[in-house]
Amino acid sequence: MKKIKLLFRIGYAYHKSAFDPIIDLLLNNDKYDVWFSLDMEKIKYFIFEFPYRNQIIEDWKKLGYRFTNETKGFDIVISGDTLRNAKDYGKTLLIFLNHGTGIKNILYRNLARSPGVKYQIFVEGQHRVDSLLKCPYLGKSEVHLIGLPKLDYYFQGKFNREEVLQRWGLNPAKKTIL
């Protein structure tokens, strides 16, 4: 049986947490051939920008994550944002799974910039569903209410506060400076 070739198109490393429960589910399913791609992050020093590759990506590779720069040949592309170059991905199922909550209007602006591109848009609440259905730029895209997958671990009891504190060397007794 041919595997379904799936790409997680992650804009920035911090977006990945929005996909983690879904990534775990699909990586452990023999029906899927799972790949990842990232935008090149940059660090700014004064007015200069330099390419930056987050160290955590090496940790992901050790966990078996496979990265590619390819855009063609995927049956499904899951992204936390609309794709600037959706046509480059060819004939594929485009899934938009927001990496944050729906209080920003960037999705609406991005949909306006890509008329004719059909996304399956998965959102966190009924207000967002209603708002998108009223949006004049929705076009052929379809909207689905699913909640925020990145919170699944918390509600499934897989979130271990002590483990997180220890892993990142955090001390809850110290004041937080933003």
Which residues does each PLM region occupy?
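Nucleotide-sugar donor-binding and catalytic loop/hinge architecture
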Residues: 1-4, 158-178
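Active-site and donor-binding regions of nucleotide-sugar-utilizing enzymes
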Residues: 7-158, 163
